[in-house]
Every structure is written in C-alpha cells, then in structure tokens.
Amino acid sequence: MNEARQSGPYKVLTSKKTDAALAKCVQYEWQNQSIFGGTPGATLQPGRDTGYTVFTEGSQYFVDIQPKGSGAEAKYYVVVGNWIANKRLAAPQGCL
C-alpha cells in the first residue's frame, strides 16, 4: 500500500459526510459489490494518525479517508489499474 501511496491517488474525492460515515459506507458497498460472481470483502481500519483506510482483499484497491473541513477527503488508490479499478471507484463516489 505504501508504494501505491507514493505514486499518488487514482482519484481524490470530497464529501460532506464525516470521515467515519464515509468509511463505513465504502466498506459496506465494497463488501456487497459483486466481481466475477463473488464478493471480495472489505476491511476498515483506523488511519495512521487520523481517519480511516478501507481496503479490499489483497489490498489491490484501497481508500484513505481523512477529515477535511466540515466533511472528509477520500484518496482512492489502485495497485492494478484495470476495469475493476473503475468499478471499485463507484462505491466511494456513491457514498459521497
């Protein structure tokens, strides 16, 4: 994950929701998003200093969510850029 962070996010999104609410929504959506007929699951953990990180199995797709102003900022990272990366992006976008 650190290598992906050093390369920069695939997409940066802002939300009026709190960081906790946004993180829980992304986790829920990823846990229920079917890829190849299965659901890969998603894990939510506290961020390094503040906020949260939500990641899929294998950590190929993850989002760092930090409080920003009265809402939150979500930085979406991909390890493998493919059509699944765009499908995974729909979850954080839908949670804004």
Locate predicted features:
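Mid-chain, structured segments of secreted extracytoplasmic proteins
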Residues: 46-80
